[in-house]
A protein has these predicted regions:
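N-terminal topogenic module of multi-pass integral membrane proteins
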Residues: 1-60, 64
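C-terminal ends of transmembrane helices
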Residues: 57-67, 119-127
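Structural signature of hydrophobic alpha-helical transmembrane segments
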Residues: 41-54, 100-113, 136, 163-167
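Alpha-helical membrane segments in multi-pass integral membrane proteins
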Residues: 109-120, 130-151, 158-179
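Cytoplasmic-side transmembrane-helix entry/capping segments in multi-pass membrane proteins
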Residues: 70-79, 132-138
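Short, highly charged, low-complexity non-transmembrane loops/tails of multi-pass membrane proteins
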Residues: 187-198
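Juxtamembrane loop-transmembrane helix junctions in multi-pass integral membrane proteins
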Residues: 8-15, 37-44, 66-70, 98-105, ...
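Helix-adjacent hinge/juxtasegments
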Residues: 73, 81-109
Length: 198
């Protein structure tokens, strides 16, 4: 009788979530400083949207896919391509004159669909932690406020207020990402994430 050896494969890859959260968070803060009226839209925001908000999040999503994490895979890859699509919306009409720029109604529809997607993802965070609930909750509000602003042709005051709400969302994502890094390094809770009972 032959004894069959059982081989176990241990996953030693890093947790990609902090990369995704920080890519999202830093880019969101920088964009919403523009929305809040601190500076004009410029190449810095577009570069962050392509590189850290876009590519870095997509990489994090692919890494999470290998870990079998459906929620993180869906979130990071989706929002990574959101940033790339947002940059494309701004840049494409300038590169190809035949492409008409997005008007306020089409942008409202675009942002509302992302708000709907985020609202459903927000429900998933109730099985994760409070920090992610804040990130996805404030992001849901942000998308719908941006959509309302475009649909109604809201003035600068509304858009600036929306920008400050976006800053809250971005900083919440930065906190959540850095908390995961520091907690893992310390081997204990340094920055709480607010675990939920499952």
């Amino acid at each position: 009788m032959n004894d069959s050896a059982l081989t176990q494969i241990k996953d030693t890859t890093a947790n990609p979530a902090p990369l995704g959260l920080l890519g999202f968070g830093l880019t969101t803060v920088l964009l919403n400083l523009h929305n809040a009226g601190f500076y004009e839209l410029n190449a810095m925001i577009l570069a962050m949207g392509i590189c850290y908000g876009g590519i870095a999040q997509i990489i994090a999503g692919i890494m999470d896919c290998k870990k079998g994490n459906t929620f993180a895979t869906t979130a990071f890859i989706s929002y990574g391509f959101f940033w790339l699509s947002l940059v494309a919306l701004i840049v494409l009409p300038k590169i190809i004159p035949a492409i008409a720029p997005a008007n306020e109604i089409s942008m409202a529809a675009y942002l509302a669909m992302w708000g709907l997607f985020t609202a459903v993802m927000f429900l998933g965070t109730f099985r994760l932690n409070r920090a992610l609930q804040v990130v996805f909750g404030t992001l849901t509000v942000l998308f719908f406020l941006l959509a309302i602003g475009d649909a109604t042709g809201a003035g600068a005051g509304f858009k600036h207020a929306t920008g400050f709400e976006g800053l809250l969302c971005g900083f919440a994502a930065i906190y959540t990402g850095l908390a995961q890094v520091l907690n893992e390094l310390a081997g204990k809770i340094v920055l709480p994430l607010g675990p939920v009972k499952k």
